[in-house]
Amino acid sequence: MNANAQLMNFPIDNVIQLIRKKWVVQIINDLFFGKTRFNEFKENKPKLSNRVLSSCLKDMEDNGLIKRIVDKYDKKNVRYYLTDKGQSLNKIIYEMAIFSVDSENYTDKTKTELKLVFKEKLL
């Protein structure tokens, strides 16, 4: 396959397909910030229903972004973790976060603080 044909099958499309579903980027961000439980992902997301979150987590697991770990002694104790593939999105999430911070009307001090937090958690 020549270079032009490969560009027609744009590699970025694969990444976009992985993260395009609503809530995926927010959940990945939550995982980078240490959240691992179903109800933790719902915090500060009042419009995120249980059904949608379950579907989203299943899709993320099916696509190899997260792994679901069920406690062998307590089947109700379920945690989610980023896989290596999921963790490799750190730079993409970081750049999106920085773009967002720079695009909002934050004070310079707040922008600096937010960028530091994102750098610490994502890079």
Label every PLM stretch briefly.
Residues 41-68, 75:
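Canonical helix-turn-helix DNA-binding module
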Residues 72-95:
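Basic, amphipathic "hinge/linker" alpha-helix immediately C-terminal to the N-terminal HTH DNA-binding motif
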Residues 32, 70-72:
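N-terminal secretory/targeting leader peptides
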Residues 91-123:
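Amphipathic alpha-helical dimerization/coiled-coil segments
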Residues 62, 82, 119-122:
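Loop-helix junctions at membrane interfaces
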Residues 1-8, 44, 56, 77, ...:
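Recognition helices and adjacent regulatory flanks at domain boundaries
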Residues 10-52, 79:
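N-terminal helix-turn-helix DNA-binding core of bacterial DNA-binding proteins
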